């Protein structure tokens, strides 16, 4: 079983993956870690500032095949990052798709208006990262794009509009329940 967690920067993808690790005892792969490993090892000329499209083209094929391998091996894995393409399902056969749960974390525009300072203040709740200089307008645009893409494609999104910790706890519980109710993959 594989859980894919997508969303724009600062929505708490790594935080949710860490909560799922603690709750389900499932390992997770941060696509940011994969990105930095490939960059620092010299396996790509891309940089952390490269366009998301270029980074997705590099990272997603690797993550996709890791997801397939986990499913084939009957293993559980959470993959989180902003480099999961919206049309990821097209790259998996139906029997694999049945073993994938996807959720895109999205802040509502009103939430960002009310809590932008808190969002930035909590950017290091799981990992210590350098201040990214987050722009509120750009973050609102990113979240609106994610919401629209999920709605158009019929993909699951989780709209964060109220107390953050309670929302993430509820989503974590929902995902835990869903994954326990599903069966194992039989190739």
Residue ranges and their predicted role:
Residues 14:
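Walker A/P-loop
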Residues 100-145:
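A glycine- and Lys/Arg-enriched "phosphate-lid" helix/loop adjacent to the NTP-binding pocket
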Residues 54-99, 103-107:
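Glycine-rich phosphate-binding loop used to anchor ATP phosphates in small-molecule kinases
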Residues 11:
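ATP-binding Walker
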Residues 144-187:
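NTP-dependent small-molecule kinase module
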Residues 8:
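P-loop (Walker A) phosphate-binding loop of NTP-binding proteins
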Residues 18-64:
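Conserved substrate/cofactor phosphate-moiety recognition/catalytic segment
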Residues 5:
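Hydrophobic anchor at the beta1->P-loop junction of P-loop NTPases
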